[in-house]
């Protein structure tokens, strides 16, 4: 059996051995009337050895402010459901990260809105697969936004930072206003 592991701390980490209890058939010294060796069931425990791996820490140099632990190769989008509203209408703002990496181990950035706009807690959605090549898919937060007064309210650009294993550098993607 193969498993994808995502370390959450650096240093030397020990992976405990995998143990299985299996039933095996063991030959006895007796034979049946046809001369065949008789077998009995026995329970055996098999164990793989423990493994020690060395996990390098992420570099401190160049770490962006607001870095939340994303490691991999990602795309970042901020998409409003509408750009023009009538009085009393709301809009949904989708903040999404897609790609390959530790998708379940970081938090998405939260939009910053003026005090005259109500921002409700997000609905979190995950569409993730974990094949042996690594975790991939999309995570998103869907915010409902309701302006309290008529006017133009630009949504400030949002930034998402991640560590790109391919280049060995931090990368930051910023949404348009």
Task: Indicate where each model-derived feature is located.
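Surface-exposed interaction/ligand-binding surfaces
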Residues: 1-177
């Amino acid at each position: 059996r193969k498993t994808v592991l995502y370390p959450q701390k650096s240093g030397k980490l020990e992976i405990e051995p995998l143990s299985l209890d299996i039933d095996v058939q063991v030959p006895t010294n007796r034979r049946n009337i046809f001369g065949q060796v008789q077998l009995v069931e026995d329970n055996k425990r098999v164990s793989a050895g423990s493994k020690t791996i060395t996990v390098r820490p992420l570099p401190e140099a160049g770490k962006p402010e607001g870095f939340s632990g994303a490691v991999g190769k990602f795309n970042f989008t901020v998409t409003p459901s509408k750009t023009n509203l009538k009085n009393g209408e709301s809009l949904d703002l989708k903040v999404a990260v897609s790609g390959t990496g530790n998708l379940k181990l970081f938090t998405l950035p939260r939009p910053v809105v003026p005090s005259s706009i109500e921002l409700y807690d997000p609905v979190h959605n995950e569409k993730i697969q974990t094949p042996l090549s690594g975790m991939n898919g999309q995570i998103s937060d869907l915010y409902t936004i309701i302006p309290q007064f008529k006017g133009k309210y630009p949504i400030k650009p949002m930034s998402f930072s991640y560590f790109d294993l391919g280049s060995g550098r931090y990368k930051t993607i910023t949404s348009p206003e």
